[in-house]
Design a protein with these regions (language model features):
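Peri-membrane helix termini and adjoining interfacial loops of integral membrane proteins
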Residues: 30-40, 112-123, 214-221, 265-270, ...
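Flexible interhelical linker loops that connect adjacent transmembrane helices
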Residues: 258-288
Length: 511
């Protein structure tokens, strides 16, 4: 590629990334500006809903984070390594592919008043959940699959397996191996995954509306309600509540760091003392239970769904927005990986490491400034801020695994950088690109706040309709919306898998 054209492409890439990530700046300004006034803080803390909302947020987030970590560690200790671990990892997508709203809807249809459990066992229906315990437990089950998925990539290293075999052969228990080997080895990946889980659990709105306490709701929901009101004072309180979510995230990070440091000091040295092996039944049970929850979710929604009442407009909007957002993200990321900066850019990961509510507020500020609110384009643009980092999470490791010897051979043949990109790297990236496309589509399908806020309620999707119906209405209609929200990503995943398999037969080197 000629140098002027290369510079033009790099400039265009940076401009596109700046447009997508621009909401980070007004999001920061939205949080900082009201925080400079003591009167605004006094108005926030004087609100009678704040203490209970804050308590419910802390309880649900703590249960979600600790529960997901505990489930993941129990499964790893019981199964890794071995054929059972491989089977569990192969079945993990059964739960990972389920959108959070669909998973929460199935839990609502089982445990809520008027649900299946209430119909058959009314005396076992849980009482009013003011602390968000049910929300936390649901998130713990769902996020444990994500945590296992992250850790499975780290645990695939051959070095760890060899060291574990040595410790096992010396007679040390699995929990001793966990303390001495596994946790220190996966610490960095575990820390990033836990940060993403805590940030998402703190700021989740759609699932909290479905399962969380209603009056008062969690802090994220009440902040969302304040921000969407026309009163400037209420919007200021919403901005401060969003800042409070950021402060809570910082507190969780500090607490996690202190707990990690304290735990490391208590680890005994490898001194030859063998501790008796603990029962592995809980881990084996959880490993069997986790994938089945995804299957049960699909079966339950399929049984209860009233297919005659599907909202075709919501279905079409979800499909088109998801396809467009995933395609734009895939194109930009492949070009970014080739012609972008070679060093890792940490700011690309901020949307999945920070609470979503302030970022959506920043998007809305920019949309108002450009008179784009209420448009289809603004909704797709809003989705890109979360679609891109999740797709990059899939693409970047595969890109780094490309054999440099192939590039060197192409260069010795006199191929240009553009020709190497299109004829060498893109074919090698086909399968990861298809997987990333399916992941990006599912992330776009699940977006609730950007769709509702940037679209001004004009573009109903399966997610927004499911959340709206969860507050009351027919269980059949609710199940139908959630089922289609679940089926669309599954269909895209199946299609991408078929395309990858077909290409593998056509081009033997891609098998």
């Amino acid at each position: 590629m000629a140098t002027p054209l290369q510079y033009a492409l790099i400039f265009l890439l940076w401009a596109m990334m700046a447009v997508i990530y621009a909401p980070l700046i007004p999001a920061a300004l939205t949080l900082i500006s009201p925080a400079l006034s003591l009167t605004h803080w006094q108005a926030l803390f004087a609100d009678p809903q704040l203490p209970q909302a804050l308590l419910a947020t802390l309880v649900s987030t703590t249960i979600a984070a600790v529960g997901a970590l505990l489930i993941a560690l129990l499964v790893i200790v019981a199964l890794w390594p071995g054929p059972k671990w491989q089977r569990m990892c192969a079945r993990l997508p059964w739960l990972l592919a389920i959108p959070h709203v669909a998973f929460a809807t199935s839990a609502l249809l089982i445990f809520a008043d008027g649900g299946l459990l209430y119909d058959y066992f009314p005396y076992f229906t849980p009482p009013m959940d003011k602390l968000g315990i049910g929300l936390g437990l649901t998130l713990a089950v769902k996020e444990s699959a994500f945590l296992l998925w992250i850790l499975a990539a780290v645990l695939s290293e051959k070095r760890l397996l060899q060291q574990l075999i040595v410790l096992d052969s010396l007679g040390y228990s699995r929990w001793q191996c966990l303390n001495w080997l596994l946790l220190p080895s996966v610490a960095s990946a575990l820390a990033m995954a836990m940060l993403a889980i805590v940030a998402w659990s703190l700021s989740v709105v759609d699932v909290a509306i479905i399962l969380g306490p209603g009056n008062p709701p969690t802090l994220a929901v009440i902040s969302w309600q304040w921000l969407t009101q026309g009163d400037a004072d209420q919007q200021t309180k919403g901005a401060l509540a969003s800042l409070l979510l950021m402060l809570l995230l910082a507190a969780y990070v500090l607490l996690g760091y202190l707990l990690w440091r304290g735990w490391r000091r208590t680890i005994p040295r490898v001194d030859g003392v063998r501790k008796p092996a603990t029962p592995l039944l809980p881990g084996n049970t959880l490993a069997s239970f986790l994938p089945l929850t995804g299957v049960l979710c699909v079966v339950l929604l399929a049984i209860l769904a009233d297919q005659s009442t599907i909202n075709s407009e919501a279905l079409i909007n979800s499909l088109t927005m998801g396809l467009v957002a995933a395609f734009i993200s895939l194109l930009l990321l492949l070009l970014w990986l080739e012609w972008g900066p070679q060093r890792r850019q940490l700011w690309l990961w901020l949307p999945i490491l920070l609470p979503a509510l302030p970022l959506v507020a920043g998007q809305y500020t920019l949309a108002l400034w450009q008179n784009l609110d209420g448009s289809w384009t603004a909704v797709v643009w809003g989705h890109l801020l979360w679609v891109m980092p999740w797709m990059l999470f899939i693409l970047q490791p595969a890109w780094q695994r490309i054999d440099s010897r192939l590039i060197l051979i192409a260069q010795t043949l006199g191929w240009s950088r553009a020709k190497i990109f299109f004829y060498v790297k893109c074919p090698l990236m086909l399968r990861p690109a298809l997987i990333a496309f399916a992941v990006g589509f599912s992330v776009s399908i699940a977006q609730y706040m950007p769709t509702l806020w940037l679209g001004a309620g004009r573009f109903p999707t399966l997610t927004t309709e499911a959340v709206a119906l969860s507050s009351g209405g027919s269980n059949g209609i609710l199940a139908a919306q959630a089922l289609w929200q679940l089926l669309l990503p599954l269909i895209i995943f199946a299609l991408t898998a078929l395309v990858a398999k077909w290409v593998g037969y056509v081009r033997q080197g891609l098998r």
